[in-house]
Amino acid sequence: MPGAASIVAVLAALLPTALGQANQSYVDYNIEANPDLFSECLETGGTSFPDCESGPLSKTLVCDTSAKPHDRAAALVSLLTFEELVNNTANTGHGAPRIGLPAYQVWNEALHGVAHADFSDAGDFSWSTSFPQPISTMAALNRTLIHQIATIISTQGRAFMNAGRYGLDVYSPNINTFRHPVWGRGQETPGEDAYCLASTYAYEYITGIQGGVDANPLKLIATAKHYAGYDIENWDNHSRLGNDMQITQQDLAEYYTPQFLVASRDAKVHSVMCSYNAVNGVPSCSNSFFLQTLLRDTFDFVEDGYVSGDCGAVYNVFNPHGYATNESSAAADSIRAGTDIDCGVSYPRHFQESFHDQEVSRQDLERGVTRLYASLIRAGYFDGKTSPYRNITWSDVVSTNAQNLSYEAAAQSIVLLKNDGILPLTTSSSTKTIALIGPWANATTQMLGNYYGPAPYLISPLQAFQDSEYKITYTIGTNTTTDPDSTSQSTALTTAKEADLIIFAGGIDNTLETEAQDRSNITWPSNQLSLITKLADLGKPLIVLQMGGGQVDSSALKNNKNVNALIWGGYPGQSGGQALADIITGKRAPAARLVTTQYPAEYAEVFPAIDMNLRPNGSNPGQTYMWYTGTPVYEFGHGLFYTNFTASASAGSGTKNRTSFNIDEVLGRPHPGYKLVEQMPLLNFTVDVKNTGDRVSDYTAMAFVNTTAGPAPHPNKWLVGFDRLSAVEPGSAKTMVIPVTVDSLARTDEEGNRVLYPGRYEVALNNEREVVLGFTLTGEKAVLFKWPKEEQLIAPQ
């Protein structure tokens, strides 16, 4: 089994570096890493279950499964001395040996597979399935796939937990939006759309991890992160640890938080992570408006759900934010604002001082620890061996359909950007020898992105093609940003000249985009583009694979007629090489679509990444497909097929879909099965899709709404739904139904309220607007969601 880099080692190297990044837009705080933080904070997960059969806790209320989770947790916490209480306020909880409470590690990772676990060196528990990164999975436009992946991750996580190698909660999913293309962690997200994509991903992932909505017991505890307004690492020396992001109420409500509303209200996530950055002057982890007014009072966060600080974020409230006068006050401000658990050591190292200075009370600490243990109780932590999920073992990891699903997810996620007809390759063609060139040609762990555990196997493109019917010649040609030696490109050209067809596998990787590292530009690395141009000049058939999570400006390749095909492969996971080879050779047909905009390079050169305003103004050309006023290289939602599809309004759609709706009547309807009337479909956008080509293929679609209703400026369009039809045979047709909810038609006003405006609306199929359904909303405008007044309940100390 190919080895994978230890996530612990990666994070240990990464996080202190991140803490040391200076923020040149602020006072020079001379930021240094908290010297006490990482040795304890980074301990890998794993714990034993409390003994509720014969241990000291067995006769207490916490082991009484008939009692309410809150009461059980409160009873446990009441048994702790103040010192024991303090020692359980961080991610590395010490437990309380005196009463038989084991130590517990809150920090476990599950971004696209089990990670930050206590993996064995070989044999059982030595690996976990590594699925594609979320940016790739979302491109498949298959919500069922997201749920299936999360379900398998939770099964594997439970097996590790039952073996004492993992915890019951995970620091996933990352549901921030990929707003600016330079962001290093965009690969971890579902793309640039908040209302539809990020919210759908949040719902499907969280319910898959937790075992459903209102699951009892919870399978695992998901953590929605990073709340809120976090989408920059170190762009232009603006450190994520000290950034104060200026966000209007309108943008905060419309773009930076709706996915957290869905995660809390609809998916019933049991944990939320507050982010490093500040918003409008207040660090997120000491922001009572975020953590109490919005999350608990407005977003309907579950009772006793807990908030964890990002790792070191409580310390950052003091340094570099300077919001608190010292680390002790930073800890006090954060716990009182609503950060229940500190991923770090500011809480356990400083609460004695905070308590002595009367900045916190025992009740403040008890509230946070009670919330953590109430969630663990809901996950069966104190329920004994007969509790559901306690019988999941390594055999369940091995026997799940995980490896097949990992391949399926990779194959479904690959986007065909350009094709002049060269693809798919066929065995009847004259192509016998393929030159495989580039820094991704023999990629292994490179395909996993970040936050991964050791995979059971890694299939590179080279390995996959070597197992095909083609003769493969391989040379790297160039690395990601530099040539390995002075002759590497000339060697690649010689190899290419002797082949019938060339595949260049390149793009960007975690040497350019990752946590704590943004890109400085969105161009192809010059060394790679130079080699691609030389390969194109040979006049041989040339296929280019653009890999990595963030987009690069591929206009030179799009416009070069000697580049016959261009594929975006993202981070496709452990089976990525096989999926790419199968797409190229026609064993699978591409159907994915971009979930980010591919901007021209000038966009990142002239528009600062710290400008959080979505709407165009002055030098701001507008951000995301909703507001961008320029011409993208490839649009959000772009993706080609190997076959031809036609789409038409479904027969009878004119009667099924009314063309006029009165707002008062719509909002006055009964809504059985829905918590809120605005969650109901106003109409079903129904289209018939026919495969008029000669290849079986999946079909994906996005439904966009546009309107001039409400105040200017008006968005270009916005996404209200998507779907994927599987295996549409040549000559056959299938019907696609995309519900368009009442809420999806609302816009956000300057106060942050979601408002349904009267006027003319259109729902259109894909960017090409193959099918357009027009309708009118009549009557008076109506506020569907009232944004609360922004004020801090807790003053800084």
From Swiss-Prot:
Subcellular location: Secreted
GO cellular component: extracellular region
SUPFAM superfamilies: (Trans)glycosidases, Beta-D-glucan exohydrolase, C-terminal domain
GO BP terms, alphabetized: arabinan catabolic process; xylan catabolic process
Main location: secreted
Secretion signal span: 1-20
Positions annotated with a glycan in the UniProt record: 23, 87, 142, 237, 326, 391, 404, 442, 479, 521, 617, 644, 657, 684, 706
Broad EC category: hydrolase
Pathway: Glycan degradation; xylan degradation
Tagged with keyword Secreted: yes
Pfam families: Fn3-like (PF14310), Glyco_hydro_3 (PF00933), Glyco_hydro_3_C (PF01915)
Keywords of the record: Carbohydrate metabolism, Glycoprotein, Glycosidase, Hydrolase, Polysaccharide degradation, Secreted, Signal, Xylan degradation
Official protein name in the record: Probable exo-1,4-beta-xylosidase xlnD
